[in-house]
Amino acid sequence: MTMDFADRVERVEPSATLAISNLASRLRADGVDVVDLSVGEPDFPTPANVVEAGKRAMDEGHTGYAPSNGIPALKEAIAEKLAADGLAYDADEVIVTPGAKQALYETFQALIDGGAGGGPGDEVVLLDPAWVSYEAMAKLAGGALSRVDLSAHGFQLEPALDELAEAVSDDTALLVVNSPSNPSGAVFGDAALAGVRDLAVDHDVTVVSDEIYEAITYGVEPTSLGTLDGMAERTVTVNGFSKAYSMTGWRLGYLAAPADLVAQAGKLHSHSVSSATHFVQHAGVEALRNTDEAVEEMRAAFESRRDMLVELFADHDVDVPVPDGAFYIMLPVDGDDQAWCESALEEAHVATVPGSAFGTPGFARLSYAASEARLREGVERLAAGDFL
């Protein structure tokens, strides 16, 4: 029997990082020491008090189904956190999801329609470089993509506002803003966000503000897009626990949005994942309320690593755009970036991610969610192999 697959799935390409991941796995299986700078997760343990809160919740019997949109205690804690950021959401305007990725997926599915008869669907505007799953989510929802390249502007949005204005129109259904950015680490300033606001209001566009890295910044304070005049009613704020609290495997995130969007996304949520894991949500309450010191320790470590990496590359006469947030650096590379990454892995045994995976060829993304010793080793190997 030959299965006939849905067009929406056929439109999605396999991850551009798959070849790198498979090659790294083969090398490790052969006993090769791979310096893995491709990983997008913190290398710190989850704070001990959060782990204990999760254990305690299991001991107390919180192992059954949770309310679909989230337990009241966590939704209230999220609303309090957002209020501290200047965002006025009621607890009922929050959906707790198994990871921020699910929150994004539900948002795309709730807002984007495919075109009639297989034609172009609703327009989604991405700012490149853009996290790899935005494109896939847009395609799975039937959307058509429009992309604005920020690489010529040092990955900053403000100098590219004219280009963004050309991309956004009355036909645009959704604009995705990720600040701090994965993969560039750029944090968009108030002038850039004001430009986004003006375009969104003028063209009646909904904006997704993906703020998953908002706790990991260096000398700048990110502004939440929904705090700007005219944006509360047209912004879906997405965040999660994976990056700030080193809880990637716990799978916990959320969206906050106007009540009508929450009602529609809630239908998708209840008919797909049902709910985020019950005891994990109790751990999330602890993370939001009692981890300031641990979060700052991780942030400071990332900043120290960033500074070290920038200096190491400068020692080899390589200038890299200095990120203001997240834990990635975009390294300019010559030629085909996919081939460069594969060769760097095969020959220098350093794993990185090609910039083309994010819509920006000519770069490799390096994660500094690794020890300083491994980061030094990685740069030394790249230099010795003439990759710098």
Regions found by a protein language model. Give the residues of each.
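A glycine-/small-polar-enriched, mobile loop at the entrance of the PLP active site in fold-type I
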Residues: 39-42, 56-74
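Short, contiguous pre-domain boundary segments
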Residues: 2-8
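Glycine-rich loop at the start of a catalytic domain that most often binds anionic cofactors/ligands
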Residues: 47-55
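N-terminal helix-turn-helix DNA-binding module of bacterial transcription factors
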Residues: 8, 14-16, 59
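PLP-dependent class I/II
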Residues: 2, 13-15, 20, 27-34, ...
